[in-house]
């Protein structure tokens, strides 16, 4: 499973159209369709009813919250990494002493 497949899945859930989801994702409709088909193959079944409207199947409904959480966590990880690499990360306090410890 790849992140772009998850993003396309979520876009298709929102748009309910392969053409609109592809446009929203910045890819061609055949690329989005191929990615969704590969995801369906990996998960073992159809995620969407394609006719008359694009709607989630039972399997699609079952995996939706998990794929959505993966996307949310990936975004949080990206934000945390950017914060650290741009100097906005967690701070560490370091204490030193000018006195030496006596003999043990």
Show where each model-derived region lies.
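N-terminal short secondary-structure element
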Residues: 1-31, 35, 63-68
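Short amphipathic alpha-helical coupling segments at ligand-binding clamshell hinges
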Residues: 59-66, 104
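N-terminal winged-helix
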Residues: 29-30, 79, 85-104
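Residue cluster at the C-terminal edge of the helix-turn-helix DNA-binding motif
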Residues: 15, 24, 37-46, 78
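Glycine-rich ATP/GTP-binding catalytic cores of kinases/NTPases
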Residues: 19, 53-56, 84-90
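A short LG(V/I)-centered, amphipathic sequence patch enriched
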Residues: 40-58
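Nucleotide phosphate-binding site architecture
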Residues: 19, 48-49, 101
